[in-house]
């Protein structure tokens, strides 16, 4: 996704509260020229429009600083007022010059599980995104998760996922991604079958009195 974004360098001594009263949002760029950070600002309307189009810690976008640096960045953090929800601050991270970056990628489930199609099972998606390390020059939009072979009772773990080349998962390998459970009707039938099996089990015959 290409989202041109131009920010101004923040004036020395500018007070964030005063800026917000004037319709400007303070921001900061990290990873710019090593560990140096750069104080920035942008119009509130521009910031709010940006937040409608990008995902925190996921979308890489081009950023240009007026009369200064330009390059690709991640939107790392968004701060809102805890009471009123007012936008307070944005943090960006420059990805250029880094061998890999850490970000969150959404999971896209593909196929129809056999256990759903044949047995009426219910698929529960436990995980909706993965935290990964990836080269900044080749970031996939999402991680595809093929669920077509899942049967009722199956559980899919992070370690089972097929990842694009160069992607390294940060999440715990044994974290559950999805599992397939019987439908309520299926569970009821299983309970009935179990009860019938218990009744049909041959029990010990009572002893008869001699006489």
From Swiss-Prot:
InterPro entries, from UniProt? Answer: Rbsml_bL25/Gln-tRNA_synth_N (IPR020056), Ribosomal_bL25/Gln-tRNA_synth (IPR011035), Ribosomal_bL25_b-dom (IPR020057), Ribosomal_bL25_C (IPR037121), Ribosomal_bL25_long (IPR001021), Ribosomal_L25_dom (IPR029751), Ribosomal_uL5_bac-type (IPR020930)
Keyword Lyase present in the record's keywords: the answer is no
CDD domains this protein is in? Ribosomal_L25_TL5_CTC (cd00495)
The protein's job, in short, is: This is one of the proteins that binds to the 5S RNA in the ribosome where it forms part of the central protuberance.
The Swiss-Prot or TrEMBL record describes its family as follows: Belongs to the bacterial ribosomal protein bL25 family. CTC subfamily.
Self-association state and partner proteins as the record states? Part of the 50S ribosomal subunit; part of the 5S rRNA/L5/L18/L25 subcomplex. Contacts the 5S rRNA. Binds to the 5S rRNA independently of L5 and L18.
Tell me the protein's name: Large ribosomal subunit protein bL25
Please report the organism this UniProt entry assigns to the protein: Gloeobacter violaceus (strain ATCC 29082 / PCC 7421)
Q: Which gene encodes it?
A: rplY
């Amino acid at each position: 996704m290409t989202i041109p974004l131009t920010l101004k360098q923040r004036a020395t001594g500018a007070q964030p509260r005063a800026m917000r009263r004037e319709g400007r949002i303070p921001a900061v760029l990290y990873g710019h020229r090593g560990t140096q950070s750069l104080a920035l600002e942008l119009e509130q309307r521009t910031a709010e429009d940006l937040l409608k189009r990008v995902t925190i810690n996921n979308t890489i976008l081009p950023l240009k600083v007026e009369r200064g640096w330009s390059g690709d960045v991640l939107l790392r953090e968004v701060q809102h007022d805890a009471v009123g929800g007012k936008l307070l601050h944005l943090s960006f991270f420059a990805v250029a010059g880094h061998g890999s970056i850490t970000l969150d990628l959404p999971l896209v489930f593909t196929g129809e599980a056999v256990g759903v199609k044949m047995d009426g099972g219910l698929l529960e998606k436990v995980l909706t995104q993965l935290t990964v390390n990836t080269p900044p020059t080749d970031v996939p939009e999402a991680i595809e998760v093929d669920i077509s072979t899942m049967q009722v009772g199956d559980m899919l773990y992070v370690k089972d996922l097929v990842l694009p080349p160069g992607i390294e998962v940060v999440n715990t390998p044994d974290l559950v991604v999805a599992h397939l459970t019987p439908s309520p009707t299926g569970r009821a039938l299983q309970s009935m079958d179990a009860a019938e099996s218990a009744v049909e089990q041959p029990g010990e015959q009572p002893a008869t009195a001699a006489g």
